Curated annotation (Swiss-Prot):
Compositional bias of kind Polar residues: 309-321, 877-897, 916-928
InterPro entries: Cnn_1N (IPR012943), Mto1-like_Mto2p-bd (IPR024545)
Organism: Emericella nidulans (strain FGSC A4 / ATCC 38163 / CBS 112.46 / NRRL 194 / M139)
Gene3D superfamilies in alphabetical order: 1.10.287.1490
Principal location: cytoplasm
Stretches with biased composition (Basic and acidic residues): 58-90, 294-303, 984-1001, 1028-1040
Descriptive protein name: Anucleate primary sterigmata protein B
Amino acid sequence: MTLKEQSSTIDRLSKENFDLKMRIHFLNEALNRRSEEGIKEMISENVELKSDKLKLQKDNQGLKRKIRDLEKQLKDQQSDKESMLNHDPEGGSDEEDRDHAQDEELLFLRERVETYELEIERLRSESIARESEKRRLAEMLKSLNDGRPTGSDSGAREERDMWKDMLDAETAAREQADEENKRLREELMRVRSEATYAIAPAAPLRSGHRNRGDSLVSHSAVSDRELYRNTAAGSSSSSTLVMEFELLKQENAELRREVSAQTSMLTSRNREKERLYQEIEELKLGQRRDRSIAGDSILDRSASRAQGRPSSSISDRTGQSPIDDAEREDWELRNGQLRDQVSALKLENQAIRQELEELDKAYSADVEQAEEDIQTLQQERDQAMQVAEERDAAFQELRAEAQEELDALGDELDQKIEECQRLTEDLRTQDDNLRALQAEMRSASEGIIRLEEDAQNNLQRYKAVQQELEQCNEEMESLEKSLYEANSKVQRLTVQIESSQNEIAFLREEQDGDKIKIGDLESELKTYRMSLQSEKDKTKELEGRLAEERYQREVVGSKEKQEVQRIMNELNREVSAAKEECRKLKKNLSAQEIETNTWKERLTDLENNLRETLGDLTGSRSSLIANIMKLQKELESTALELESTRSTLDEKETLLRNRDALLESHGLESRKLSELLERERQARRADKQSFEQALKSHHQASRTITQNNSRILELENARNQDRKRFTSLEQQFREQLNERNSMLLTIWKRLSGMCGPDWAHSNSLINGNLPSQEVIGNILFWPGFSRNLLLAVKTLENVISSFKTRVKDVERNLTKQYQTLEHAFSLRIKKLDRLEETTMNMRAQLQTRNQTGLSPELSKLRGENRLLKAELNLLQNHPRSRSTTAGVAGSPQSSTIDLAERGSLVRANTAAESPARSSIPQPAQMTNLAEPTGAVTRPRQFKPSDNHGNQEVWIKRLHELERRLKAEREARLLDRNGARRRLEERDAENKRLRAQLDRQRLRQGVSTETSTDDGGHGPPSEPTTGDEGYREREEEHSSSEGEGITVDIEV
């Protein structure tokens, strides 16, 4: 290859490398976008863009409204100004200044509207560009999937299924995110509307000047945001991310402010509700006090009447008590319902606060994750820049090395051309060498095919080993899972044992408590019986009092008639006062009803607002109704229970009365004895039952304790066995890890040795550390080590993939050189034939001269003398051509030259033709050419003087030619022996190269397997330094071969 071809191939390869880098970059971006983090980022970006769009639309609408209001104000001010100018021309200057300021503000607002419209268009174009980029990436993935070989259909199907699943998951996640975003936006809008509704009544309309100031402030804030965004769009990707993060922080702060305002409003409303509840409870307490006063006993009334007290208005009001009680019960029910509603609203408020706190936490976590992602992206960008700079430096070094190698190859070519000139005389041996070389080429091609087959077999073996490794990893994972499950089971069993122990203690405590309760119940029974006896005594006393009071009423009846009229008057006065008090109470009740209605409306508004905030417009009311129904059911159940208890109490009372009647018939002594007997029997029965229950519980506890102890022993044994297994598994796993690390280290050493010392020196460091078992075993250094391994494998792939091209180039060069050698071989065979013919003719002439005499020889010599004179004249006329092309006159094309002269000049001609073909003149050859010409010219000058001397000269020349022929034959024999020796050396070198090829094929199998595991089925990403190193070694080897390789080229 020439320098131009090599430079063109280098440029082509660099372009292909750049294209592959770009494709890898875009594919990595697509994969990152299709990952979970990328999906989250896209969702967050989508949410941000939509929220920004909504904000911009709202701002745009607000600005349009403000522009309309300002235009209206302008028109009004212009009309006012005209009227003022008509009435007061001096105040026109102030109005003009105001108009100028308002015009500037209008221009500013219009500019802001235009910028907002441009921002909306830019966001739309960005969304369209993102969609087109997604489509382009999808088409690229489809093309890549279509461009893969048919052998990897199963892998392609798996990848397609994986991409489909990822797409479905992404769409589902995006739909969920959109739904959540819509829900959150609706809730935010509702909360904002509630806040505006709550704030709107308290905030009257301000003047136009204040509106103008507020608009300027808001537009300044919006302009600041847009300036942030414009600067972010102009800067790099990292700055854009930082600015977006700052914008997110600002929006987060605004949202927190809104949430704090809403929470403050809610707290104020809750305080108002609590105040209302307190007022309602106070009203209830007052009503209950009134009821307690109205429910005085009959004895108090009779006592008051007997003592001559004036009857109270409350006693006369007892006739209206049923209606008041019903109304009060209704009010109490209403108050209970309101209280339940308020409690439900409190619970809903608490749930909303919890959701807000959770959302705040999630948002802060997302912000932190975004910061971490930004930092990781910046680090990856810096690493990529460093790698790119290192690769550029390596490429420049490789280019310089290639240039130096090309210069060295040029020098070596010159040396080889000289060696080829020395080997031109070995023509017959080259036929055999040609055949041997052809056979060796065939055997080499067969060996290469065999090596390729071996490489494929090694690839299959490597795949099998990789599958076995994966199976081992899966088994390790399953063992780890079983270990985790066993640990969880052990923990569960320990918890169960503790719970069983707690239950045993609890049962013992319950047994002790039951005994205490039995004693308490017995004491309560005694107290109930004593109370019954006392009540009976009280009833007897009351009957006596009633008889006495009746007697006193009959006695005092005559005296009371006189006082009745006075009492009636007083009662009428009290009734009128009571009526006035009732009216006042009704007014108060009506006012309270109005207040309760207002509060009911507020409560309904609050319920509706809370339902809107929660998004459940129907659920809260039904839940409230369900709670009320539950309470009603509980009330009914409690009422039924009360009725049942009352019935049981009545039954008991009847039983007690019957027993009392029976006991009165018997005597006190029999009654006492029977009671004592029954008590003793009951006590004995209770003791027996308690003793039996205690025995049963004791036996059950002992059984459970023994069972638990046995279970504990079994679990401890199983736990010890599991620990032993886990320790053995951990040891095996560590041994396997050590073996793996040692194997990876040996693989790395061999791969780096194959890639060359320069490559190993530039790529051996892993975060500043040399590769070792400890470094490989560390999780932090594993990505760097795996990256270096993949780089080494890729370099070997590039080296092995370039073998075919090199072999083809060598074959082409060999065919070209073989053709040139065949041509030169044919020409030199012809020249040798001519030389043989000339020598045979010379011998025949010598024999004829000896036989026939000197007369024809003299005539021939004279003719030759004439020809030599003519040649001398020509040489004198053309000295330059004689000095450069002295051997042209002796070429076989001139038919008039004598055979003897041709024989004398044939060696010079054969020596002069080789440099003429090689197009590189040599000084030694020029001197060799000059010498025979001088040898020819000298005898020509002495020809006319002495024929006998000329004849002796010709004889000497013939002897010299014979001697030269013998020397040439001996040189040919020596050259043949040297060529054979060189061929043997070349055979040994070929064997060594075949061994290297075998090793490289094996390593290529390992590297292709790792590349397939890595997912890279396409072409190699970039030409690495390992390929160049191998080329250097190969070229050095070819230069060190010397003459053996020149023989190959000749063939």
